[in-house]
């Protein structure tokens, strides 16, 4: 095998040896990037509007949570499948089908009249739209010369990080100004434009329809069982006490059996549905681990911040979106900065700096109180945005830019899958930490709130005086004191979760030691060694 950790001259451009970016290809790529943005945005765009969707469809809180879960499960199955389909159908046809399917299912979601219909169409939306995400990553590293990667990488890195970050903001604004139906209708016009634009402009490669005759249906079934049940366990496990719930236990068993069957099939099939060969490249393997861990923070903090603001501060969806927008703005302005740094600084140093900066932003939140508001969250969110961009963008290059062009399509699906799985695992772990640590703090605080505690007695008396003439003031005061204890315990639980994340990302920064020095982004053509 050729040196798996450095790029050979034959890798440099994929489709072209020219250092000049063809305008047609550039415009086609920009259209594809917008498609990827829509697909990733729709993961989180409904998160701030689930209450409105629940009311509109007369659904229970458990049922409406599946509006997001169904999308995630379908997407995580489809993303690794895109590598095979991209080779069989070609980039043009696969992306057009994906964009059209995403647009059509968005229309169906907007017209859904029951929760069952909504869940079905959301699953279809996630499955069909998922193909756009890894296809953009693969195209970026095969159609552009290496000397232009420092321009292309920040663009796709920005979209991959910005879309889930601003999702709640966009969703909150749309629902507040119009209705939840427009969360889906707003995709229609851009989706049609993207579909037509891709069909007219994309000419990056040629399809190989003969591959469809060798499609591994058993591999698809095993992969669907493995990844779908894994996503379900991670999504539903924390709220149902994991294996104590029958459905979670059954899915865990399906996941275990399907995983064994899937890896056996991938390693023995003549034309496997997923090619694991890319993991023989050390930089790709380490990059996937980094991507998985970056997904923990990307999706984890997109969940933790809004939950704190809603649960402790009582913010509306719109107010939460406005507060969270700071991270998105920081990422936007950091994208060109990171692109410029990639020309001058070793990518490993940029990644390490990004991870430590992200850890610092989380560390500042370990002293969180129930008074933390927009201004207290300002600096941590700025650090989060800086850290995420500095970690994500160079990781994309380290993982994908050193692969042979014919390996990038399969590798891109695996690489993007790691980010989504990292997010799912991160959310499950963060939920578990929040629940366990909150219960622990409630127990400790209750042990201290006794009749012998002067401060507790004074607080209780103050509550009782304010509630005079409103019934049993003593009983109501005790209820208020109990609520105060539970709220304070929850805040302390958030502090513990942020502390855990800060330690995790400091430790993760050491992983860059295992990355072989990547070729310079300023190098072109044969200079990439």
Stretches found by the model and what they are:
Residues 2-20:
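Short, Lys/Arg-rich, polar N-terminal cytosolic tail immediately upstream
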Residues 9-12, 63, 193, 398, ...:
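Hydrophobic transmembrane architecture of multi-pass small-molecule transporters
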Residues 23-83, 87, 92-95, 106, ...:
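Transmembrane core module of solute transporters
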Residues 48, 72, 79-219, 236, ...:
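Helix-loop-helix hairpins in multi-pass membrane proteins, especially solute transporters
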Residues 107-111, 195-200, 260-264, 363-366, ...:
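Membrane-embedded alpha-helical segments of multi-pass transporters/permeases
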Residues 113, 145, 201-205, 238-239, ...:
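Short helix-capping/hinge motifs at transmembrane helix termini and TM-loop junctions
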Residues 155-159, 290, 414-418:
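Hydrophobic alpha-helical segments of secondary membrane carriers
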Residues 184-199, 223-226, 251-255, 496-513:
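Symmetry-related core transmembrane helices of the 12-TM Major Facilitator Superfamily/SLC fold
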């Amino acid at each position: 095998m050729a040196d798996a950790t450095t790029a050979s001259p034959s890798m440099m451009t994929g489709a072209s040896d020219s250092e000049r970016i063809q305008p047609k290809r550039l415009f086609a790529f920009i259209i594809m990037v917008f498609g990827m943005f829509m697909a990733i945005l729709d993961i989180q765009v409904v998160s701030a509007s689930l209450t409105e969707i629940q009311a509109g469809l007369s659904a229970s809180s458990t049922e409406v949570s599946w509006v997001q879960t169904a999308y995630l499960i379908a997407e995580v199955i489809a993303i690794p499948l895109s590598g095979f389909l991209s080779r069989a159908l070609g980039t043009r046809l696969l992306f057009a089908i994906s964009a059209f399917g995403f647009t059509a299912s968005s229309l169906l979601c907007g017209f859904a009249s029951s929760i069952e219909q909504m869940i079905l169409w959301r699953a279809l939306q996630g499955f069909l739209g998922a193909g756009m995400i890894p296809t953009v990553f693969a195209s970026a590293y095969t159609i552009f010369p290496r000397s232009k990667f420092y321009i292309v990488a920040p663009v796709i890195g920005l979209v991959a990080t910005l879309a889930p970050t601003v999702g709640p903001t966009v969703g909150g604004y749309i629902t507040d100004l119009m209705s939840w139906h427009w969360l889906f209708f707003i995709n229609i016009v851009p989706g049609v434009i993207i579909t037509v634009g891709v069909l007219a402009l994309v000419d990056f490669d040629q399809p190989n329809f003969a591959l469809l005759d060798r499609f591994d249906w058993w591999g698809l079934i095993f992969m669907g069982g493995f990844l779908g049940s894994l996503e379900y366990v991670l999504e539903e496990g924390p709220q149902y006490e994991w294996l104590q719930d029958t459905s979670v236990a059954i899915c865990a068993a399906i996941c275990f059996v399907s995983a064994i069957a899937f890896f056996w099939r991938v390693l023995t099939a003549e034309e496997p549905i997923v090619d694991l060969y890319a993991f023989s490249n050390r930089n790709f393997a380490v990059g996937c681990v980094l991507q998985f861990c970056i997904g923990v923070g990307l999706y984890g903090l997109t969940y933790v911040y809004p939950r704190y603001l809603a649960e402790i501060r009582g913010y509306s969806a719109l107010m939460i979106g406005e507060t969270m927008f700071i991270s998105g703005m920081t990422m936007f302005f950091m994208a060109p900065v990171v692109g410029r740094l990639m020309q001058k600084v070793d990518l490993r140093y940029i990644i390490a700096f990004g991870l430590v900066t992200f850890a610092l932003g989380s560390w500042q939140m370990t002293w969180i109180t129930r008074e933390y508001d927009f201004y207290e969250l300002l600096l941590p969110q700025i650090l989060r945005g800086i850290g995420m961009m500095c970690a994500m963008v160079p990781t994309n290059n380290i993982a994908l830019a050193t692969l042979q062009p014919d390996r990038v399509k399969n590798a891109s699906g695996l690489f993007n899958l790691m980010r989504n799985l990292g997010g799912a695992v991160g959310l499950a772990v963060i939920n578990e930490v929040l629940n366990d640590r909150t219960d622990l703090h409630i127990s400790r605080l209750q042990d201290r709130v006794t009749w012998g505690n002067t401060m507790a007695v004074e607080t209780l008396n103050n509550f009782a005086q304010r509630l005079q003439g409103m019934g049993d003031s003593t009983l109501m005061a005790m209820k208020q004191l109990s609520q105060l204890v539970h709220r304070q315990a929850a805040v302390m639980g958030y502090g513990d979760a942020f502390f855990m994340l800060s330690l995790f990302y400091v430790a993760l920064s050491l992983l860059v030691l295992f990355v072989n020095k990547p070729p310079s982004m300023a190098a072109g053509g044969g200079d990439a060694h």
